[in-house]
A protein has these predicted regions:
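A short local loop/turn or secondary-structure capping micro-motif enriched for an aromatic residue
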Residues: 63-64, 198-200, 228-230, 335-337
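Intrinsically disordered, low-complexity regions of eukaryotic proteins
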Residues: 8, 46, 98, 173, ...
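Bacterial peptidoglycan biogenesis and beta-lactam-recognition machinery
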Residues: 49, 58, 217, 223-230
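Tryptophan-centered motif/residue detector
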Residues: 33, 80, 101, 179, ...
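Outer-membrane beta-barrel transmembrane strand signature
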Residues: 15-46, 53, 141-222, 265-295, ...
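Extracytoplasmic gating/loop element in the C-terminal half of outer-membrane beta-barrel translocons
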Residues: 226-316, 321
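Extracellular/periplasmic, surface-exposed regions of secreted and cell-surface proteins
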Residues: 1-144, 280-352
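A surface-exposed, glycine/aromatic-enriched loop/edge motif typical of exported proteins
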Residues: 1-11, 51, 122-178, 234, ...
């Protein structure tokens, strides 16, 4: 109930200062645990002599009385910074589906299965203050949604800069990112930040698992994917010379007076000079949907009669690979870990097992 105590200094500065305690944040003796109303409806069935199995589940999770800061309380009533109350509310819902088909045709066997998951939420109440513009509100929007500026390309001349709204982040020059003035007040600032894309957590995740076998030979594959997800590229991906580093090959497509239709803004080694270009915007937040061939395995299981002669219970030769192919519009880095510091690992394994 007492979120914080701070030191209160009294007296003159002679010798060692004596410390004491003051009340910094008002307590709330009426706090309670958050509450939830949860609904789950599901089915689990097998059909066609157990060759087809299906599982489906719908869930709804409405939480209220969440412990959040009430920013609507005026400071006129006293020091109420970070005063928390049970006023938060968020509603979530989604669906999980999975299915698998197994069958045989003569000496052939095969299976194909899939999973699908969708979830989303809506922030109903969080104690935020009234906003001057509808697009600044968090209430009524999904939790964790990306917000930023709308990038409108690059400034190509000083005349274009003079005729444009003032960008308040740092001094700009030709080659810097030009942002859209959403509220039309003649300057670019936090009031021009709008929802862009989705959040970092995918709303949709899915997988496909399939395989075929014939007289000891088998091929299996697993595909995984995600959709309705947006990620911000890290500084090292977007900005050359970050942390005294180098310039990467993909960053060579930078703005120059002779190359105005570039992917990246002008080159600079000064952090302050490029502060304008480092803002969260549609330039560095992109859709990170992907489909990946996660694993692929080709194998042969030797017949039991053959390996019994050498006193083995089982012998398998296989070649497997991991993260072999990824289909995505999210360039340069792994869409699941968008940093050049964490490259996607592709691996192959060729083993004998017994």
């Amino acid at each position: 109930m007492w979120p914080q105590n701070e030191v209160y200094i009294t007296g003159v500065n002679m010798g060692t200062k004596l410390g004491g305690y003051i009340q910094d944040i008002l307590p709330n003796p009426g706090l309670t645990w958050e509450k939830a109303r949860i609904l789950n409806i599901g089915i689990d069935t097998r059909l066609f002599s157990d060759r087809l199995s299906v599982t489906a589940e719908f869930f709804k999770d409405n939480r209220h009385d969440m412990y959040v800061v009430n920013n609507k309380i005026s400071s006129l009533v006293g020091n109420v910074k970070e005063f928390k109350q049970n006023i938060g509310k968020i509603n979530s819902h989604g669906v999980d589906l999975s299915a698998m088909w197994n069958s045989n045709i003569a000496d052939w066997s095969y299976f194909i299965g899939g999973t699908f998951s969708y979830s989303t939420n809506e922030l109903i109440a969080n104690g935020e203050v009234d906003q001057p513009y509808e697009w600044l509100k968090n209430q009524g929007r999904p939790l964790g949604e990306n917000r930023g500026y709308i990038a409108k390309g690059f400034f190509n001349s000083w005349e274009e800069i003079a005729a444009s709204p003032v960008q308040t982040f740092s001094d700009v020059q030709p080659g810097d990112v030009r942002y859209e003035d959403i509220n039309k007040d003649g300057q670019i600032d936090v009031n021009d930040m709008v929802p862009i894309g989705y959040g970092d957590i995918p709303r949709i995740m899915y997988g496909i698992n399939l395989g075929v076998g014939y007289k000891g030979f088998s091929i299996t594959a697993l595909f995984q994917g995600a959709a309705k997800v947006s990620r911000q590229y890290s500084d090292i991906v977007m900005n050359p010379f970050t942390d005294n580093g180098t310039i990467f090959e993909h960053q060579l497509d930078y703005w120059t007076p002779e190359h105005q239709h570039a992917t990246f803004p002008r080159l600079t080694t000064l952090d302050n000079a490029s502060l304008n270009n480092r803002q969260i915007s549609t330039l560095n937040v992109k859709d990170a949907d992907f489909l990946r061939l996660k694993t692929l395995e080709v194998a042969y299981d030797f017949p039991t009669k053959m390996i019994q002669k050498i006193h083995l219970k089982g012998l398998r030769l296989f070649l497997s690979g991991t993260n072999l192919i990824t289909w995505t519009k999210y360039k340069w880095v792994d869409p699941e870990a968008p940093s050049l510091a964490a490259p996607l690992t592709v691996s192959y394994t060729h083993l004998r097992a017994h």
